[in-house]
Amino acid sequence: MGNVSSAVKHCLSYETFLRDYPWLPRLLWEEKCSELPKLPVYVKIVEVGPRDGLQNEKEIVPTEVKIQLIDLLSQTGLPVIEATSFVSSKWVAQMADHTAVLKGIKRSPDVRYPVLTPNIQGFQAAVAAGANEVAVFGSASETFSRKNINCSIEESLQRFEQVVSAAKQEGIPVRGYVSCALGCPYEGQVKPSQVTKVAKRLFELGCYEVSLGDTIGVGTAGSMAEMLSDVLTEVPAGALAVHCHDTYGQALPNILIALQMGVSVVDASVAGLGGCPFAKGASGNVSTEDLLYMLHGLGIETGVDLLKVMEAGDFICKALNRKTNSKVSQATRNN
């Protein structure tokens, strides 16, 4: 995992240990070699609000609002902002303005702006619009795959192979997603081995990073650990990310488990925007604000300014005429 920070180190005085970690047994402090699971020094946050966060909105969000949101997020220190999706407007009408959005944003040289491209037609349209990074979206659930992208898992992987091959010729990096990694709205529980199978294929195809998504937010720390343990037998931690929805309020615990297991890339959405148009009942992604609060509280570097992210969250919530889903923003604004 490279350089790491530790939640508890044996060099702490017992008084400090007792003050900061009163729930831990004295034995842990006494055993010099003992320490809690290690955490990354730095976590890369992939902001998915402009795409995954807005795609489920019932009312069409004006193009200029989407552009302004991305421009605000570009000033926060976020290294990656997923801008839009080059899917058919028949499937996701909210993303029909993808070309205008991608051409309208003020790109920062320090930020990458990937776009979702489900097939070769979407990839070609994205490149024509100026995309310099793309993402493909697969599923660990056969039923979800057919309902979401209208094909089987195997057929989707064949489509992605075309995209990755074309991207290599253009020198464009490709990120992969595996949805339903911890549960499916149609099939229920998903076997970890099935997640591993799809993640491995995406990695072998050439995806530099594979994001494992708890699409409907049913995962627990236990199921996250079980799933990751299996995936890590085939895909290195350095090539993995986690993407957690907060339907049951378990997103942050699940992310913490992933960090302890070596993952250092986390997807999040400003103001906790999101859901899934093909997964009824799924709530938004973990909010970027809440994730930052947890990471900074653990002493983990992100390079992201929490206050500026909150300002971007205020903007989009006002534009959508709704309250933020971020607990941090709620608490701060109420004080």
From Swiss-Prot:
The modification N6-acetyllysine is found at K58. A lipid is attached at G2 (N-myristoyl glycine). Its main location: cytoplasm. CDD domains: DRE_TIM_HMGL (cd07938). GO terms for cellular component: cytosol; endoplasmic reticulum; endoplasmic reticulum membrane; membrane; perinuclear region of cytoplasm. It is a peripheral membrane protein. Keywords: Acetylation, Cytoplasm, Endoplasmic reticulum, Lipid metabolism, Lipoprotein, Lyase, Membrane, Metal-binding, Myristate. It catalyses: (3S)-3-hydroxy-3-methylglutaryl-CoA = acetoacetate + acetyl-CoA. Pfam families: HMGL-like. A divalent metal cation binds at D52, H243, H245, N285. InterPro entries: Aldolase_TIM (IPR013785), HMGL (IPR043594), PYR_CT (IPR000891). Residues 43-310 form the Pyruvate carboxyltransferase domain. Its cofactor is a divalent metal cation. Substrate binds at R51. Its EC number is 4.1.3.4. One of its GO terms (molecular function) is hydroxymethylglutaryl-CoA lyase activity. GO terms for biological process: ketone body biosynthetic process; L-leucine catabolic process. The active site is at C276. Pathway: Metabolic intermediate metabolism; (S)-3-hydroxy-3-methylglutaryl-CoA degradation; acetoacetate from (S)-3-hydroxy-3-methylglutaryl-CoA: step 1/1. It is found in: Cytoplasm, Cytosol; Endoplasmic reticulum membrane. SUPFAM superfamilies: Aldolase. Non-mitochondrial 3-hydroxy-3-methylglutaryl-CoA lyase that catalyzes a cation-dependent cleavage of (S)-3-hydroxy-3-methylglutaryl-CoA into acetyl-CoA and acetoacetate, a key step in ketogenesis, the products of which support energy production in nonhepatic animal tissues. Belongs to the HMG-CoA lyase family. This is 3-hydroxy-3-methylglutaryl-CoA lyase, cytoplasmic. The gene is hmgcll1.
